[in-house]
């Protein structure tokens, strides 16, 4: 099937939609299981999603075993819906200033550390 065929043009959208449905559902499930008072669910999904996306991208680069469709479904679809910047921003503004700083620092620090850890895992060793 060539790239001009209507199905070939719709396929990426369907792959993203399927991944997005799964990612958003998983995000809701994680957030629903963690205690309130602090946005633990958003922090957890952002850190886990950063780790998973790091694994996906570094593994794809190192092994070249993941197809473009797999990267699109898992990266753009599932993990982009699993992690959430907008919820992070809204929840942060609802916190008192000291806790808002903790939340911002924790989200960014854990996100970067998760990507670094994923990179180390794909290379076969932790730093």
PLM features: residue spans?
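Membrane-interface helix-loop junctions in multi-pass transporters/channels
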Residues: 1-127
